[in-house]
Amino acid sequence: MTTWTAPLAPQPVHATVTVPGSKSQTNRALVLAALAAAQGRGTPTLSGALRSRDTDLMIGALRTLGLRVDGTGPELTVSGHIAPGPHARVDCGLAGTVLRFVPPLAALADAVVEFDGDEQARARPIAPLLDALRGLGVRIEGTALPFRVHGSGALAGGTVAIDASASSQFVSGLLLCAASFTEGLTVQHTGAALPSAPHIAMTVAMLRQAGVDVDDSVPNRWQVRPGPVAARHWEVEPDLTNAVPFLAAAVVSGGTVRITGWPADSVQPADNILSVLGKLNAVVSQTDSSLEVRGSGSYDGFDVDLRAVGELTPSVAALAALATPGSVSRLSGIAHLRGHETDRLAALSAEINRLGGDCTETPDGLVITATPLRPGVWHAYADHRMAMAGAIVGLRVAGVRVDDIGATSKTLPDFPRLWARMLDASLPDGEEHGM
């Protein structure tokens, strides 16, 4: 682990930032490219793909399944067939997309594929997806990592009911492979309110872009017809969730940050992100190719339902902790975060309170009363979003040390350098922040 002193922003931050490609879109595109190649449709390609631990784990998983992925940077080519060798083992690391998108793909192999990952990943929810695959006739050993998928070379498909209240990725994982099932697939969500619905919308949009027929006209029900998956070129958008900490720097410092490449029409939950920023006295300006946020440096507490965009919670909690002293913020709709890379609600409460803050867990979220914070160690829990949240707090509080900034390699390996470059752009000539 690499301890990192979060740099202070003693003056307004004014910078232009370019963030790499979307993790969510990259890993979905890789799965769809693998399916197209396996169907013999051609050679799909990706440009702007994110290269990080999560996406490299997905590339490794596809190679384990017998596919070929060429390219060392953001330009990738996928070819080959689903034909794992003996003793095939997929390393999921801590990547939820690998854990939940690849088992349905492995079910199409005529082989046994073992799945395992980081110790923390063994606590991440997966049983509902495995049960759904069993309901479709797949033989699976285990109910959590490590587990084995006994593929038979084909899958009939049909109809499956699943409780995806713990993770929308259960639904996405099934939908991504459904067109390759003999009968297609109908997925019915049967549980409580579905979290991260925009990520299922992203999956549906990308399936349609690949020529797959998807009917999502009935709430909580998705029907995918069997058929070809196009071997197309995927242009990956910048990761808008990873852009949020940089936009937060404008909010807390009273500066202006512009994100380049912000799409005018996105498959990511852009509208949800803009809605959150609108609660923080921020002025948001958007063009066809960028987004600019001008912060006031001061804002009151706020109420926000983050069910659709739970990934934003650590950054939003950090912003709540830095609001006008005495103001109260309520973050709701995020009970499912207890099953993310770490229990994010417990982790955020512990770290904010460790620095002298006032954060209380509720059944489905957090209540944060802004109080002056003190220097100290901010623990990342091997969680990229937690590490970035510590960086946001450090903009306003001198002496905050993130105990594992390397956790950001999960989705943004260049985070420390990008963060320092953003702050350096606001300093007088000749001065710079350390990385």
Curated annotation (Swiss-Prot):
Q: Binding positions for 3-phosphoshikimate?
A: 23-24, 28, 167-169, 196, 311, 340
Listed GO MF terms:
3-phosphoshikimate 1-carboxyvinyltransferase activity
Q: In which pathway does it act?
A: Metabolic intermediate biosynthesis; chorismate biosynthesis; chorismate from D-erythrose 4-phosphate and phosphoenolpyruvate: step 6/7
- InterPro entries under this entry? Enolpyruvate_Tfrase_dom, Enolpyruvate_Tfrase_sf, EPSP_synthase, EPSP_synthase_CS, RNA3'P_cycl/enolpyr_Trfase_a/b
Q: Which keywords does UniProt give here?
A: Amino-acid biosynthesis, Aromatic amino acid biosynthesis, Cytoplasm, Transferase
> Listed GO cellular component terms?
cytoplasm
Q: What is its EC number?
A: 2.5.1.19
Just give the chief location class: cytoplasm
- Pfam entry (one): EPSP_synthase
Name the Gene Ontology biological process terms: amino acid biosynthetic process; aromatic amino acid family biosynthetic process; chorismate biosynthetic process
Which CDD domains does the annotation name?
A: EPSP_synthase
PANTHER family from the UniProt entry: AROM/DEHYDROQUINATE SYNTHASE, PENTAFUNCTIONAL AROM POLYPEPTIDE
Assembly and partners are described as: Monomer.
Family, according to the entry, reads as follows:
Belongs to the EPSP synthase family.
Protein name according to UniProt: 3-phosphoshikimate 1-carboxyvinyltransferase
User: What organism is the protein native to?
Assistant: Mycolicibacterium paratuberculosis (strain ATCC BAA-968 / K-10) (Mycobacterium paratuberculosis)
Upper taxonomic classification of the species?
A: Bacteria, Bacillati, Actinomycetota, Actinomycetes, Mycobacteriales
